[in-house]
């Protein structure tokens, strides 16, 4: 589990219990939580209230099962389930804005007004980090490098995280890279072999803006952000356009803020001010927002306690966690 599995990946097959933000393998997930409580945090779960986060528009059963495991397997005194994007906004010191959160399994656009997510305008895009890693594996194969095993996928993920960037103008960048080798970078594989990566550096994350690269029919993140804002009340759109906060690991590419600014400016009315906020710590802003929320004195009445769970069962999570 965790880093130990990574360090032995050469002889193991790596599996992920979460797909597109939804837990698909509960036994494995329980092992990860066990590892987190006992080996990483080194705390006694039965003494530690724990906040969990999830993607918006997740199946209700997912929440209930999560709550059930926390109370029945780990005997927590209290728990709370909250939506990731809202926490990212808190971490940026805002209560109103549109959050574009993109992690490993799912991306979502969540408009928040005065601290409340607007459920009718939340849009979800099942295109995120893992899809980009798979796509990079595919286009690296076209270059003649073979990456197929789960261990090799982790190498490609590392290449993606270290070398990929988002082009401001994709066509222009393609022309530049065809004419010169200025964007070529080399990467040393664990076995010492050095490989070269060229236009794959920006072709890979370009799929966020052009999902057709992955054979998907959905529109890109910029259009999804715009659609989400347009689903909101006309009076608050101006505030949302001026507070677009990006968060999650898949927003860490250099160039993402400038590109979003350019694309959304092209979609929005000319008079509207558009501001993209991309805090440097955005990979962890959900966690930061969670620690802010959990430490507020006003939040202490919000926890679902073990007593409440024993009385009402897992369904209580829908009543107490908005």
UniProtKB/Swiss-Prot annotation:
Pfam families: Actin (PF00022)
EC nos: 3.6.4.-
A single Gene Ontology CC term: cytoskeleton
Source taxon at top rank: Eukaryota
Keyword Cytoplasm: yes
Name assigned to this protein: Actin
A GO MF label: hydrolase activity
Membrane-spanning intervals of the chain: none
Similarity section: Belongs to the actin family.
Catalytic reactions of this protein: ATP + H2O = ADP + phosphate + H(+)
């Amino acid at each position: 589990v965790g880093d130990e599995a990574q360090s032995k990946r050469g002889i193991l097959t790596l599996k992920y219990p979460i797909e597109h933000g939804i837990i698909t393998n509960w036994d494995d997930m329980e092992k990860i939580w066990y590892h987190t409580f006992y080996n990483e945090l080194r705390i006694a779960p039965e003494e530690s209230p724990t906040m969990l986060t999830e993607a918006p528009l997740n199946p209700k059963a997912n929440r209930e099962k999560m709550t059930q495991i926390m109370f029945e397997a780990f005997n927590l005194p209290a728990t709370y389930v909250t939506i990731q994007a809202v926490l990212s906004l808190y971490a940026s010191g805002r209560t109103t804005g549109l959050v574009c959160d993109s992690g490993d399994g799912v991306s979502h656009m969540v408009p928040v007004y005065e601290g409340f997510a607007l459920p009718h305008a939340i849009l979800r895009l099942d295109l995120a980090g893992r899809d980009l890693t798979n796509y990079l594996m595919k286009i690296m194969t076209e270059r003649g490098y073979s990456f197929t095993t789960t261990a090799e996928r982790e190498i490609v993920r590392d290449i993606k995280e270290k070398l990929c960037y988002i082009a401001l103008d994709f066509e222009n960048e393609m022309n530049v890279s065809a004419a010169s080798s200025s964007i070529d970078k080399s990467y040393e594989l664990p076995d010492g072999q050095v490989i070269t990566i060229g236009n794959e550096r920006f072709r890979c994350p370009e799929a966020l803006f052009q999902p057709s690269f992955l054979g998907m029919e959905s529109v890109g993140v910029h259009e999804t952000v715009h659609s989400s804002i347009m689903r909101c009340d006309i009076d608050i759109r101006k505030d949302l356009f001026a507070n677009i906060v990006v968060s999650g690991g898949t927003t860490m590419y250099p160039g993402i803020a400038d590109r979003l600014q350019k694309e959304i400016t092209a979609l929005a009315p000319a008079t509207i001010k558009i501001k993209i906020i991309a805090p440097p710590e955005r990979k962890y802003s959900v966690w930061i927002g969670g620690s802010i929320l959990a430490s507020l004195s006003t939040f202490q009445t919000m926890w679902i306690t073990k007593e409440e769970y024993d009385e009402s069962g897992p369904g209580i999570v829908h009543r107490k966690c908005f």
